[in-house]
């Protein structure tokens, strides 16, 4: 219907990416933990396809929208029941740290991010908070994929839009679901910096 109505390839790809992002935003924590990978794959595929359609729209790539839509449709059971997204009033991004520090902060992380943006908060500050979590934790490749895709897709919508808020709230939920980690990465970075300076890591007795 959208194609017949004259939607552009970019618009089709952006709509698909939004639908895939909402699978993360509405992912209920009662699902198996491994199912986060299912919604992650659908979203990152849709983001990659959208970026390709922006650069080089073609009939073959538009066909990929159909494949992606089928994937999003097949993942619908992961949103039954759908997680409720309640905006946290007077949201403070510093409160996200508590969501990274303890298990069970998935819904609160989404509410903080959503509340921050819907109340006029600066999108770039939320993105910075998500980036800080990537650096502070032992982030996996999927984490970087989800955050990168969320930032790109949120930027595809007007600043202050509902769509952008929902997308970034989903990214916050995804990170909260996978934290805390052992947080060995900062130690590795500090060790690498010391080695680069030529410091002695161990002293012989």
Task: Give the predicted meaning of each segment.
Residues 1-205:
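Mature, well-folded catalytic/scaffold domains that follow N-terminal targeting or propeptide regions
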């Amino acid at each position: 219907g959208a194609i017949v109505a004259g939607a552009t390839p970019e618009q089709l790809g952006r709509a698909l990416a939004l639908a895939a992002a909402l699978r993360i935003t509405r992912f209920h924590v009662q699902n198996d933990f491994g199912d986060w990978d299912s919604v992650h794959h659908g979203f990152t595929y849709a983001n990659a396809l959208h970026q390709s359609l922006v650069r080089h729209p073609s009939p073959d790539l538009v066909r990929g929208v159909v494949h992606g839509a089928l994937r999003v449709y097949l993942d619908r059971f992961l949103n039954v029941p759908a997680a409720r997204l309640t905006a946290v009033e007077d949201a403070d991004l510093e409160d996200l740290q508590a969501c990274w520090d303890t298990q069970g902060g998935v819904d609160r992380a989404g509410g903080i991010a959503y509340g921050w943006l819907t109340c006029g908060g600066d999108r770039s500050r939320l993105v910075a908070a998500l980036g800080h979590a990537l650096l502070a934790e032992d982030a996996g490749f999927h984490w970087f994929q989800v955050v990168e895709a969320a930032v790109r897709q949120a930027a595809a919508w007007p600043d202050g839009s509902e769509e952008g808020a929902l997308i970034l709230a989903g990214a916050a939920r995804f990170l909260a679901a996978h934290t805390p980690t052992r947080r060995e990465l900062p130690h590795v970075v500090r060790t690498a910096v010391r080695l680069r300076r030529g410091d002695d890591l161990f002293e012989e007795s």
